[in-house]
């Protein structure tokens, strides 16, 4: 099933995989959070699990603060910081409901969490302590850091753009250009916009500059749809990850496929083989050479028999990730 450019990690989580994140400066280490209440650190080239720590409920997201510190949150409402060298942990704080998103903003040096309690909280990683709580209009489903800005996707198809240096007011309030519930938002590495996916097999490419001439460039497209017996099956697009160098992006859907897209020329660059089950999370390494793919059943069809959850590590090439022609 897997070729010479791809392998499956040993010792995968024992339940659904919620998030995969590479270390900020190397493709050697991968952080993985899971519904089995664990966060795991893998040494990717060695194909071994280096460390595991627990929450008291399913872990919904994790992030590196720096190469030696992991942050994580989930259904137990707790935000933890774990020292990956000493295996010591610190309960940093809590939300009033499950923590859905954990991200680090290097430009402002804050950790950001988003919760189903309808707030975003900022955390000073040096102390560590809470550095502010900011109300959102609905439950937070997804968020992404773009330079010193924060893009938040909530229930009710709302999108909010915040300035992390001045959280006193919302910079922009938007509505998703897609008709159905938002599943994932990820910011372009060039900081000009973001990509948003929905549960209804669609992706939107959006721009942050509100001027009419820039807004004219935004568009949306259908993807992760399969014709079966002449009936189109439409799948949620669960995961997005950007290639830091080329500003192209990968999407993963509940159809088990990973696609790589060129947003400038509006083209699909490639599609990988079908994975055993839904793609729950994706992460490019910082240098863009490696893609981590979490194939993990997301209970779209209730608790039926399903393939084992797994993490695939794929070496990707420029041919798969680089825009084909000069972008005008």
Curated annotation (Swiss-Prot):
GO terms for biological process: attachment of spindle microtubules to kinetochore; cell division; meiotic cell cycle; mitotic spindle assembly checkpoint signaling; protein localization to kinetochore. It comes from the Eukaryota. There is a cross-link at residue 216 (Glycyl lysine isopeptide (Lys-Gly) (interchain with G-Cter in ubiquitin)). GO terms for cellular component: bub1-bub3 complex; cytosol; kinetochore; mitotic checkpoint complex; nucleoplasm. Has a dual function in spindle-assembly checkpoint signaling and in promoting the establishment of correct kinetochore-microtubule (K-MT) attachments. Promotes the formation of stable end-on bipolar attachments. Necessary for kinetochore localization of BUB1. Regulates chromosome segregation during oocyte meiosis. The BUB1/BUB3 complex plays a role in the inhibition of anaphase-promoting complex or cyclosome (APC/C) when spindle-assembly checkpoint is activated and inhibits the ubiquitin ligase activity of APC/C by phosphorylating its activator CDC20. The modification Phosphoserine is found at residue 211. WD repeats lie at residues 4-44, 47-84, 87-125, 129-164, 170-210, 217-263, 267-316. GO terms for molecular function: ubiquitin binding. Its main location: nucleus. Interacts with BUB1 and BUBR1. The BUB1/BUB3 complex interacts with MAD1L1. Interacts with ZNF207/BuGZ; leading to promote stability and kinetochore loading of BUB3. It comes from Homo sapiens. Poly-ADP-ribosylated by PARP1. It is found in: Nucleus; Chromosome, Centromere, Kinetochore. Belongs to the WD repeat BUB3 family. Signal peptide: none annotated. InterPro entries: G-protein_beta_WD-40_rep, WD40/YVTN_repeat-like_dom_sf, WD40_repeat_dom_sf, WD40_rpt. The keyword Transmembrane helix does not apply. Keywords: Acetylation, ADP-ribosylation, Cell cycle, Cell division, Centromere, Chromosome, Chromosome partition, Isopeptide bond, Kinetochore, Meiosis, Mitosis, Nucleus, Phosphoprotein, Repeat, Ubl conjugation, WD repeat. The modification N6-acetyllysine is found at residue 179. This is Mitotic checkpoint protein BUB3.
């Amino acid at each position: 099933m897997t070729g010479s450019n791809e392998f499956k990690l040993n010792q995968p989580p024992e339940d659904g995989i919620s998030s995969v994140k590479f270390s900020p400066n190397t493709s050697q280490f991968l952080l993985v959070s899971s519904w089995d209440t664990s966060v795991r650190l893998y040494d990717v080239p060695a194909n071994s699990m280096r460390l595991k720590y627990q929450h008291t409920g399913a872990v919904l997201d994790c992030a590196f603060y720096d190469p030696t510190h992991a942050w994580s949150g989930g259904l137990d409402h707790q935000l933890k910081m774990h020292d990956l060298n000493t295996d010591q942990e610190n309960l940093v704080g809590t939300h009033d409901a499950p923590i859905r998103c954990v991200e680090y903003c290097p430009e402002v040096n804050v950790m950001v969490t988003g919760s189903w309690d309808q707030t975003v909280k900022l955390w000073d990683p040096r102390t560590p302590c809470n550095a502010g709580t900011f109300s959102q209009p609905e439950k937070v489903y997804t968020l992404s850091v773009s330079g010193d800005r924060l893009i938040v996707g909530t229930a009710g198809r709302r999108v909010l753009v915040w300035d992390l240096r001045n959280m006193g007011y919302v910079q922009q309030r938007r509505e998703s250009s897609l008709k159905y519930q938002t599943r994932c938002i990820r910011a372009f590495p060039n900081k000009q916009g973001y990509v948003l996916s929905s549960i209804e097999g669609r992706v939107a490419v959006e721009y942050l500059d509100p001027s009419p001439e820039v807004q004219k460039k935004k568009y949306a497209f259908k993807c992760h749809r399969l014709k079966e017996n002449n009936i189109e099956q439409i799948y949620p697009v669960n995961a997005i990850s950007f290639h830091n160098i080329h500003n192209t992006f990968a999407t993963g859907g509940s159809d088990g496929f990973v696609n790589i897209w060129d947003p400038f020329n509006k083209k699909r660059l490639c599609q990988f083989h079908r994975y055993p089950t839904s793609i729950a999370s994706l992460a490019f390494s910082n240098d863009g050479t490696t893609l981590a793919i979490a194939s993990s059943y997301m209970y779209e069809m209730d608790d039926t028999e399903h393939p084992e959850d797994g993490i695939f590590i794929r070496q990707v090439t420029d041919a798969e990730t680089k825009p084909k022609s000069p972008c005008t």
